[in-house]
Amino acid sequence: MEANLPAVTYLLMPKRLLIADDSYLVRETIKNVLAGRTDITVCGEASNGLEAVEKAKALKPDLILLDLAMPEMNGAETASVLKMTVPGVRIILFTMYSENVGSYLTSAIGIDAVLSKPDGMTALLSAIETALTSTSTLIDEQKATQKPAETTLPSVERRKASQV
């Protein structure tokens, strides 16, 4: 929750979505599907895991849609970092793989949903709505009061250093 806004005002604001997928076409398709919605706004895009972490820290979205197979850092690694650095964020993993990866990822990392891309946009929209409506006031309050972790995972630091 924005620090200076009353809880009621925050709850009425459009929820902010960050889309992280290495496919430009997938990102554009999702943006086009959500374009007419007033309850959700796409606040940013990322084409790899490292970019998703940086943008999420800066933009503080309510929900992040992650592709599992991304360059730099895959969706599972990215989700793990995000859960530590962006408190209260909801995460949906959107993948070409079967949903069989879902049970491990949802329990071990805390991902809210794992969807197969072949299931299509209707399933994705349903998962987005579920993730956003199940975000209770308590979670919003925790998000407002918790501070993101100051440290980054060593693997992220190594990848950043190797890019320089």
Predicted regions and their residues:
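Conserved acidic segment of CheY-like receiver
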Residues: 13-26, 30, 34
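Conserved sequence signature across two-component system core domains
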Residues: 20-21, 46, 64
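Acidic catalytic/metal-coordinating carboxylates
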Residues: 48-51, 74-77
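Receiver (REC) domain active-site loop signature in two-component systems and cognate sites
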Residues: 70
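Alpha4 helix (beta4-alpha4-beta5 surface) of REC/receiver domains from two-component response regulators
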Residues: 77, 97-115, 119-126
